[in-house]
Design a protein with these regions (language model features):
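Short, loop-centered acidic/histidine patches that primarily coordinate divalent metals
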Residues: 49-51, 64, 85
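Short active-site loop/helix that positions an aromatic residue
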Residues: 58, 65-79
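Amphipathic, charge-rich alpha-helical segments that serve as recognition/docking helices
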Residues: 87-89
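Short alpha-helix boundary/capping and kink motifs at helix termini
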Residues: 1-60, 73
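Short hydrophobic/aromatic-enriched beta-strand-loop microsegments
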Residues: 79-85
Length: 89
């Protein structure tokens, strides 16, 4: 992943592609990341694994699910920095 290029995507789109529910706003990690956002601090990129729609495999959020949820609470149309890995079979 260290060689993966950092890209950006809209928070709600990543959540939708992962088929995961939005974590509660009062979940401890979401709450902590919301505080960081409100202080203007940058969040680390999330780590994703590309899914395969033809096989019914959704996007996998390997690290940063709570960060995506926090950004959704702040502004669901905000971009999220991410690094993507390919799904290996």
């Amino acid at each position: 992943m260290s060689r993966a290029h950092t890209s950006r995507a809209i928070a709600k789109d990543l959540l939708r592609a992962s088929k995961l529910p939005l974590l509660p706003r009062d979940e401890s990690h979401v709450e902590a990341d919301l505080k960081r956002i409100h202080k203007g601090k940058t969040l680390s990129p999330v780590l994703l694994v590309r899914g395969d729609l033809s096989q019914g495999i959704p996007l996998i959020i390997a690290d940063g699910y709570h960060r995506i949820c926090a950004i959704c609470y702040f502004d669901e149309d905000s971009p999220v920095a991410f690094r993507m890995a390919a799904l290996r079979r």
